[in-house]
């Protein structure tokens, strides 16, 4: 599925408050599973269920066996004390791992310290420090013996976490369906080590790391995600698409033709993309770059004073420039050029499309902010374990947001979102 290419030249005329075409919203939004009588832990197990924990135990045991059968294990190594784990112990281990994100200490061994100043006896009551560290060392999510070779024509760079990502991707889509207003943006998981698909995004808090495209509802619920692993070899005609258009088409696929309103930033926004979405009964609004092909020159080159707006229309498309502290270029199929009061008392009126854009974007950054205080990933972890920890926490946040859908704005354990 892809936007149409080689569109004919658009005819732009000054906008005159035409009411844009609206598609009825037909998405079956809300919780898609029965939650009557659920305790808080039951919302968690909607995403991280017993089957997944059983799988973790199986693959952890498999990797430990593969590691210990190697020739480079010293007789005196602590790993020789390993014995197979089981789902019950794996659940205990994951519970302690999550707890390390709530009770922050600079080193793992301090959780087992008996010093009265910072002891946490719960950890030692559940398992020994050595056992926890062994489980963390051997924690695995796929069978290394099945990993594609270096010369494979299309290697899966996320092989080590693929089953976990596939499981959570499926559950995110099954448990809850977003309401009408959604957004797509990228999240950046901090990683400064060596990695072939590490990205640099200067405006993100982490700046260096693993980039993940996320489709979120305005509540913050993550419905779908896609991890960027480098340029893809996509067969024609999809290979002719820009990366950003391909990302949006992929993430939006299950929500097309249902009247959704999508908000995106200038990395994604293009005229072909918004026309493609419109052809699939999906409206969109986004900031756009000044060099975007087809954007009308009278709007692009307009010299405006603060608070002034210039808008042109071509059928369903509205192109706009608004002068605030700086020029803001917008492209939308949702709005006309209506102006509404700004949020501050002394603020100028602003185009409604900018007010709505500011309201419905930024959810991915908000998700990152909500998870950051409870980060359970240590700097010493390998990249795939850090990525796994991140998505386990994302699943936990999604479970909390579903809990809130059932219980209103009530906080849980002092945590609110």
Which ranges hold each PLM region?
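A short, flexible helix-boundary coil/loop motif
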Residues: 406-417
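N-terminal initiation segments
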Residues: 1-275, 281-283, 287-292, 335, ...
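An anionic, glycine-rich sequence signature occurring as long contiguous blocks
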Residues: 4-43, 283, 294-392, 398
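Eukaryote-specific, cytoplasm-facing alpha-helical/coiled-coil scaffolding segments in long proteins
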Residues: 117-126, 298, 302-303, 417
């Amino acid at each position: 599925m892809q936007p149409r290419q080689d569109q004919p030249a658009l005819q732009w005329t000054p906008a005159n408050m035409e009411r844009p075409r609206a598609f009825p919203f037909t998405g079956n939004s809300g919780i898609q599973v029965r939650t009557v009588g659920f305790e808080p832990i039951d919302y968690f197990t909607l995403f991280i269920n017993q089957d997944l924990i059983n799988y973790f135990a199986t693959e952890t045991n498999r990797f430990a066996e593969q590691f210990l059968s190697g020739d480079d294990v010293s007789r005196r190594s602590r790993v020789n004390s390993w014995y197979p784990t089981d789902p019950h112990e794996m659940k205990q281990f994951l519970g302690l791992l999550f707890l390390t994100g709530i009770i922050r200490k600079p080193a793992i061994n301090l959780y087992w310290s008996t010093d009265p100043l910072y002891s946490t006896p719960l950890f030692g009551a559940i398992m020994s420090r050595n056992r926890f560290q062994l489980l963390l060392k051997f924690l695995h999510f796929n069978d290394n013996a099945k990993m594609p070779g270096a010369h494979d024509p299309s290697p899966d760079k996320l092989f080590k976490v693929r089953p976990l990502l596939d499981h959570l991707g499926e559950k995110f889509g099954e448990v809850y369906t977003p309401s009408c207003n959604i957004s797509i943006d990228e999240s950046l998981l901090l990683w400064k080590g060596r990695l072939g698909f590490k990205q640099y995004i200067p405006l993100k808090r982490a700046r260096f790391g693993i980039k993940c495209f996320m489709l979120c509802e305005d509540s913050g619920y993550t419905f779908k995600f896609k991890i960027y692993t480098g340029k893809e070899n996509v067969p024609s005609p999809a290979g002719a698409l820009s990366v950003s258009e391909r990302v949006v088409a992929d993430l939006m696929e299950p929500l097309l033709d249902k009247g959704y309103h999508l908000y995106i930033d200038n990395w994604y926004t293009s005229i072909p993309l918004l026309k493609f979405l419109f052809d699939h009964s999906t409206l969109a609004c986004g900031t756009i770059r000044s060099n975007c092909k087809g954007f009308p020159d009278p709007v692009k080159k307009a010299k405006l004073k603060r608070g002034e707006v210039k808008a042109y229309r071509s059928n369903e498309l509205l192109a706009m420039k608004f002068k605030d502290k700086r020029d803001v270029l917008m492209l939308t199929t949702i709005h006309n050029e209506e102006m509404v009061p700004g949020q501050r008392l002394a603020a100028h009126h602003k185009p409604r499309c900018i007010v709505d854009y500011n309201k419905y974007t930024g959810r991915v950054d908000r998700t990152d902010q909500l998870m950051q205080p409870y980060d359970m990933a240590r700097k010493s972890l390998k990249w795939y374990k850090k990525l796994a920890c991140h998505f386990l926490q994302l699943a936990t946040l999604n479970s909390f947001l579903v809990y809130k859908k059932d219980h209103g704005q009530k906080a849980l354990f002092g945590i609110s979102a």
